[in-house]
Amino acid sequence: MVHQTDFISSTAILKTQKASTSLVHATMFERAMPSLTNAGKASSTKTYTTPTITPPSIKGNPHIWSSDKPSGTLFIAVGSVVGFIFLIIALAYIVSAYISRRQTEKLRFETIDQEFQSHVGGKSYSKLGNSDDPEKSGFLSKAVHTPQSRSVARLLDRPDFQQPSPALSNQDSSTSLAQEFYSSIRDQTAAQNRKSLFISPTVEIVNQQRKSAVLQNMNNSVSSLVSDSGAELNKPEKAAPSTRKAMYKARNKSSMGSAVGIAKSRSTSPVKSGLRDKPLDRAKTPSVYLDKMFEDES
């Protein structure tokens, strides 16, 4: 009997457990997914129609402007112009730097050649003409045509030097002589521009000889200029105009007539003539008085 009661109680417990689990599942199913009858009653469906916009065709439409250029053409054009400007600035900077470098090298070669020429003589051109540097050899070939008297007596020749022409005036000649002949010891400009400490003792002697020769040539040119100017003065090219000559003659006649009238008036005036004819009473000197006394006694 005991076993039967236990079996009945266990089966009752199992049934109650199954019933409780079925209730839980049912409630969960109802909460998670509503039934079709409840969904149809609670929700209502609404439909909306969205229109599709289609733009008109560009082909053959005069009221719509279209460009056949690709997108970004304006930015490409502006960028190319700006880049071209920057390229021009860079090229100008490079060209100016190259030109200044060439001028600096040319000045350096000129200074070296002049110093060497002043120490050695005229044979340096033939020795240096076969140099491997084309720029220096070309410069030296140009320098061969310059007179030797220019750089023999100069330790530091200036690049802006020019030979004085014989047709210069006295002032220009003096200034050119002041630039041409200078002493490496006394001249302040040469002392400031010196590039070596070498002082040639023969500079002064050569300068004096050259100065005397140039002064002699200048004297000859000045004398020739004076003789030519005298010939031009004797034969003037332009004569005075006839109207000026007539005015000058009339002026001379009027001045001469006035002078004659004044002289006549002075000679005819009785008061002035009487005053002039009457001698002035002056005191006699002692010597004249003694001479007259001795004459009366004799």
Swiss-Prot record:
Q: Specify the domain of life of the species encoding this protein.
A: Eukaryota
Record keyword Membrane present:
yes
Question: Subcellular location, in the record's words?
Answer: Vacuole membrane
- Compositionally biased residues, Basic and acidic residues: 274-284
Task: One GO cellular component term, please give it.
Answer: vacuolar membrane
How does this chain sit within the bilayer?
A: Single-pass membrane protein
- Record region (Disordered): 123-146, 226-298
Principal subcellular localization: membrane
Q: Where would you find the membrane-spanning parts of this chain? A: 75-95
Q: Which residues form the signal peptide?
A: none
Record has Thylakoid as a keyword: no
Keyword annotations for this protein? Membrane, Transmembrane, Transmembrane helix, Vacuole
- By its UniProt entry, which PANTHER family does this protein fall under? CHITIN SYNTHASE 3 COMPLEX PROTEIN CSI2-RELATED
Could you say which protein family the record assigns here?
A: Belongs to the PRM5 family.
Q: What is this protein called?
A: Vacuolar membrane protein KLTH0G09570g
Source organism (scientific name): Lachancea thermotolerans (strain ATCC 56472 / CBS 6340 / NRRL Y-8284)
